[in-house]
Regions:
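Core dinuclear metal-dependent hydrolase active-site scaffold
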Residues: 1-56, 127-213, 285-298
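Active-site environment of divalent metal-dependent phosphoester hydrolases
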Residues: 14, 36-37, 66-72, 96-100, ...
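Active-site metal-binding motif and surrounding structural segment of the metallo-beta-lactamase
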Residues: 37-92, 201-222, 237-244
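Stable alpha-helical elements in mature extracytoplasmic
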Residues: 39-43, 73, 111, 115-119, ...
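Short regulatory "switch" loops immediately downstream of catalytic or recognition motifs
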Residues: 77-79, 94-101, 154-156, 196-200, ...
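Binuclear metal-ion centers of metallo-dependent hydrolases, dominated by the metallo-beta-lactamase
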Residues: 84-91, 95-148, 159-165, 240-298
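Charged helix-capping and loop-helix junction motifs
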Residues: 166, 197-199, 227-234, 261
Length: 298
């Protein structure tokens, strides 16, 4: 296998998980999901099946933010498979010691803090790995892929975040053949709007945003208030994806108002205008970046 692939990994327990195989055989992983018990073995088996017997080498593991549905599986995975995998780098920006004053505090999301701590302990099991806190504007080249950081946690300063979604990083990955993959994580309305606001220091011109593959923001619920609906639709129009990854269950994708209700005009735009296909995360979807073929795996 001499070409790169990008896959949305099936999750039984919810969350978000992506695996990118570089043309030379190493991997870039993004987040991971909620439950190791349900999904960790599947991820390991998938990676092994794509190594051609060379062993699993993770060139970089990217993390968007610290909610448990993005870091819990990774924390256990790194612990259980310590002797079976090699991790060369972790790219993240997960603030610690923040008193979240909004949703996270209201619902008592102590579990998120627990799994954040487990994650920090797990990454330190790999002393040979480079642990790097990303900042907006940084660019990394890993194998044949360029990773740009478009948003990071500090961009909210001086306003305190009210929940972990407001610290989510946004990454753009560009493959050697020009295919681009936009990873919005759980970034929501006000932060995503800055990417299309000419008055913002975070503004990205239209050509910089265009990507063939899009990870739909926050599992299909990109904003918390109507005032940003227009900005999110503008963002999605400028990204202009051919393929959308929706990190959400099939049932939610087909039935939940988050994805289908007409009030979420930005989701309607994606469902009606995406030139190829929309994919939920109840099955693994793998894209060959050379010929753009799509493979569905159980």
């Amino acid at each position: 296998m001499s070409h790169s692939t990008v896959a949305q990994i099936k999750l039984k327990s919810g969350g978000m998980s992506y695996a990118i195989r570089l043309s030379e055989g190493r991997f870039i992983l993004i987040d991971g999901g909620t439950s190791f018990e349900a999904d960790g073995a599947y991820l390991y088996e998938y990676l092994c099946s794509r190594t051609e017997g060379e062993g699993v080498v993770i060139a970089a593991w990217l993390f968007t933010h610290g909610h448990l549905d993005h870091v819990a599986l990774a924390a256990r995975f790194m612990t259980v498979y310590r002797e079976s995998i090699r991790i060369e780098r972790s790219l993240y920006n997960i603030p610690v010691g923040i008193d979240f004053c909004g949703y996270d505090a209201k619902v008592g999301n102590d579990r998120d803090a627990i799994f954040e701590r487990e994650w920090f302990e797990a990454v330190r099991l790999y002393p040979e790995a480079d642990l790097h806190e990303v900042r907006t504007g940084e660019v990394f080249r890993i194998g044949d892929i360029v990773i740009e950081v478009l948003l990071s946690a500090e961009d909210r300063y001086p306003d305190p975040p009210t929940n972990r979604n407001e610290t989510s990083a946004v990454f753009k990955l560009t493959f050697e053949n020009g295919v681009r993959f936009m990873v919005l994580g759980d970034a929501m309305g006000a932060r995503l709007a800055k990417l299309v606001d000419p008055a913002s220091s975070l503004f990205c011109h239209e050509g910089r945003l265009q990507c063939e593959i899009l990870q739909v923001a926050h599992h299909g619920l990109a904003v918390a208030s109507y005032e940003y609906f227009g900005a999110i639709e503008t963002l999605y129009r400028r990204i202009s994806p051919r393929i959308c990854f929706w990190p959400t269950y099939a049932h939610r994708f087909y039935n939940d108002p988050w994805c289908q209700d007409e009030k979420y005009i930005y989701n309607r735009f994606l469902l009606c205008s995406v030139r190829e296909r929309n994919f939920h995360s109840s099955q693994t979807v793998e894209i060959n970046t050379e010929d753009r073929t799509v493979t569905l795996l159980e």
